[in-house]
Each structure stands twice: as C-alpha cells, then as structure tokens.
Amino acid sequence: MKIAVYGKGGIGKSTTSCNISIALARRGKRVLQIGCDPKHDSTFTLTGFLIPTIIDTLQSKDYHYEDVWPEDVIYKGYGGVDCVEAGGPPAGAGCGGYVVGETVKLLKELNAFYEYDVILFDVLGDVVCGGFAAPLNYADYCIIITDNGFDALFAANRIAASVREKARTHPLRLAGLVGNRTSKRDLIDKYVEACPMPVLEVLPLIEDIRVSRVKGKTLFEMAESDPSQNYVCDFYLNIADQILSKSEGVVPREVPDRELFSLLSDFYLNQPSSSTNNSETNNLDFLMV
C-alpha cells in the first residue's frame, strides 16, 4: 500500500506522517517513509537527525545507480520505520517531481520499492503542480492534513481537485482528512458536507504534538518516558487502523473556489444570535505546527 500525505504548508504533515508511520509499524507492518521536500526534514522525528538525501547520494556517485547500495540511502528510524529523503533541486531551479521520480527509480533499482507493506510519501506544502503531484502517480491513497482554519481547508480543496484529476488515469482514492491540533471542527464539518469525504481523525489542541517536533521525537517515543502521552498515540493508532482496513476511499469532487469562499466565510459571518457574543467562536482557528 502506498500513501501520499498532503496539506497546507506548516500544518504539521511531517509530524503527523511520522506518527502514522510508527502506528502502522506497531500494527506489524514494514513501513518506509519517503520525505519529498527540499528541506529534507520529513523523517527528522524518526531518525533524530537530517539524513542525506537521494539526490546528494546520486550526485556523490555521479549518478551511477549501480554504485549505490540500500544502506547509502535508507536509514533505520525509531520503531523500525525505514526512512528516505528525496531532497530537491537547487532553489529556483529544477523540478521536484523529477526528484521524486529519481527516488522511486533508484528504490526500484535497489529492489526496495516493493519490499514494504506500506510506503508513505510526505509531500511538501500544498503545491499541487504537475511536479509535486508526482507522488500521486504512485499512491493508492491520499491523506490530507488540515485544521479548522479557512486557509487550510482552501488548500485541502485544491489537493482534492488534484486527486480527482489523477484518479482519471490512476487507481487513486482519497482516504480522508486528518484534522491536526485544532480546538474546533465546525468548519471541517461544514466543508465535508459540501465536498463529501471521510474524516479519519481530528487531533485536539495538544501542545506536546508541537513540542515533539522540536525535540526530534515522535509521540510514541515520548510516551516511553511519559506514559501520560499514550492517549495521544491512540489517535494515530486509530488512523492506522482505518488505513489498514483498506476502505474504498473516495474520488472527491472539489467545491468551486468562489463557492467555497462564500461557504466558509458565511459560516463565520452569519453565526446564530446565541453565539454572536462569544468572540472565541467567531475567530478562525489558524493554529499550526
């Protein structure tokens, strides 16, 4: 099974991806996480350091694939999760999609691409150009990370459009949304009414999720020394269980931009009179990790 994780920049995709990878490993699956971001920090909380990228390794070998060994590019992370960082082209030059393609090509050359039960692509930001939509070419499912905010749901809608487009020629489905670190979910619910799709989980506003990224540890590793964190891990285990159930998923039909703008803005501008005095309710939730 291959999964591509997308979402608005800064929404917490890498933190969420790493914890989902661990949760899948806890369910007995062999997992490979591929970071698809020039920052090459997707797997930081799994390995504890910035691992060398595929592109760096290929450059050091003058792009002689036959000189590259699995241990040159695949690093063992916490919980037995294997980690790869694709890297990216120089800033302002090249195409990220090409880098993803080279990564998959190399892993196939190493006979590693098909050795895993689950491969998870963690893709940068909400960029859905042909290049950074490339992981969707290899994925069975897409997961969108969002929060209860206006901008994050706009990004989710654009990603949903990319999934629909790719599904025309690939057996790709949207597994669903994951709400990350949000105190409310009313806007998420409003969106999925207009664009039906599963909501796999909504993680509450837990500071330790943000702190885990700074510490370079997953929530599962933090829970080893602080068992009070186990309840947070249960959220990710629930997501893993839904993924492994191999649900049918959906081919989403995105909401037109102007219609979505009206839908989301009207929801806050026209609150019921009983709640108009509650300033907290009227504020958009823009909290991110």
UniProtKB/Swiss-Prot annotation:
Sequence positions that bind [4Fe-4S] cluster: C95, C129
InterPro entries reported for this sequence: NifH/chlL_CS, NifH/frxC, P-loop_NTPase, Protochlorophyllide_ATP-bd
Subcellular location field: Plastid, Chloroplast
Positions bound to Mg(2+): S14
A GO MF term: 4 iron, 4 sulfur cluster binding
Catalysed reaction, written as an equation: chlorophyllide a + oxidized 2[4Fe-4S]-[ferredoxin] + 2 ADP + 2 phosphate = protochlorophyllide a + reduced 2[4Fe-4S]-[ferredoxin] + 2 ATP + 2 H2O
Name the UniProt record assigns to this protein: Light-independent protochlorophyllide reductase iron-sulfur ATP-binding protein
